[in-house]
Design a protein with these regions (language model features):
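Extracellular glycan-interacting surfaces
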Residues: 1-372
Length: 372
């Protein structure tokens, strides 16, 4: 991928935008908004000329002309609140969609039609799916689908409140991946651990924290070696055996909670997270709120140490960065991107050492992806 062959797609509550860089990624051109009547969670490309948009209002939309025009692509998709759409890199034309209520759909013809992956109904503990989220969150959503570039049979998925699952046979069977994940969120400290059952509201939150330890907010699979990285409701985890066992490498008790995670492979794996220290739940436009300094954290030594990266990022914010709102390109010098629920997009060309605002005033950004 060269610097002038991609665009950054920003999905928002009211449509989506493309940001196109110049050759040096010094200037960015913002497109007119598209799909403006839809609540868009994510825009992706399949590498073969097709773009797909996951809509929380009307299912999947497809473009076959580089995003200039869009049409619904929902035949067979019987749940239209779509959180995730992902192209299988091993099978051109094969697209997956994750929806509300924990359903997984597959298209073998680039979105012309869909069939439900019914094997997921037999996944371990499936009968207990359906955790009732409090604190203004989303309910049961199949929000993440990931592939292992080194193994065409491995597929990962995440359903909110129910942890990470993996298939080793292309989706025929599924395995729950919870070994090593804390049995409960840490309690009694700052951040997610600040709940104490001193009053009825706090008692409810205390119970909530004890139950959501298995809630994976996002995973990413290394394209180099298949290692898996997880941002959990209660911590950051690494796995070097495809999720069979997790290691807690959280920054500290104050910064365990967050939504996105990403990895850029180089001389070392550079892993990025954006914590929400001491999250504030009374902010419905943002799920929960980052208040104060907006900070990105990076580790390049498997979580032994973390660098706090704030150069170019604002302080005094009241915002959030959602699970799908962090991405990178595959240039020789990778660009890193993220968007906030207050409508700002940021870019770094030095692995997060410094940041530049490349878009503002877009409304609630829900997804950031590199397409092309």
């Amino acid at each position: 991928m060269t610097q002038n062959t991609f665009k950054v797609a920003l999905a928002t509550k009211n449509g989506a935008y493309f940001l196109t860089p110049d050759e040096g990624r010094k200037k960015w051109e913002k497109s007119k908004p598209f799909l403006t009547e839809e609540n868009i969670n994510k825009v992706v490309s399949d590498g073969h000329g097709n773009f797909f948009a996951a809509s929380l209002t009307e299912g999947v939309f497809r473009s076959i002309d580089g995003g200039k025009s869009w049409k619904p692509a929902n035949k067979g998709l019987h749940v239209r609140k779509v959180w995730e759409v992902a192209a299988n890199p091993h099978e051109p034309g094969t697209i997956y969609a994750g929806t509300q209520y924990g359903h997984l759909f597959k298209s073998a013809n680039s979105g012309d039609s869909w069939e439900e992956v019914v094997s997921l109904h037999d996944a371990p503990n499936r009968e207990n799916w359906g955790i009732d989220w409090g604190f203004r969150t989303t309910g049961l959503a199949l929000h993440t689908i990931r592939f292992d570039l080194n193994d065409p049979k491995k597929i990962y998925l995440v359903a909110s409140g129910n942890g990470t699952y993996r298939s080793d046979d292309g989706g025929e069977t599924w395995k729950s991946l919870k070994n090593g994940v804390n049995s409960a969120c840490p309690l009694g400290e700052k951040g997610v651990s600040s709940a104490k059952p001193d009053s009825p509201p706090d008692e409810k939150r205390h119970k909530h924290l004890e139950e959501v330890h298995s809630c994976t907010h996002k995973i990413v699979v290394s394209p180099k070696d298949g290692r898996v990285y997880q941002q959990n409701h209660c911590g950051v985890y690494f796995s070097d055996n495809h999720g069979d066992q997790w290691k807690d490498v959280s920054i500290n008790l104050e910064n365990r909670f967050g939504f996105p995670v990403d990895v850029i492979e180089g001389d070392a794996p550079h892993v990025f997270v954006i914590p929400v220290p001491d999250p504030i739940y009374d902010c419905p436009d943002h799920n929960v709120c980052i208040q104060g300094q907006l900070s990105v954290y990076r580790t390049s030594d498997w979580g032994k140490s973390w660098s706090k990266l704030t150069n170019g990022l604002p302080g005094g914010v009241h915002t959030n960065v959602l699970r799908d709102s962090f991405a990178h390109d595959n240039s020789d010098h990778p660009g890193v991107y993220f968007g906030t629920t207050t409508g700002d997009a940021y870019f770094s060309d030095d692995l997060g050492e410094s940041w530049k605002n490349i878009a503002t005033g877009l409304g609630r950004i829900q997804g950031v992806n590199v397409v092309g």
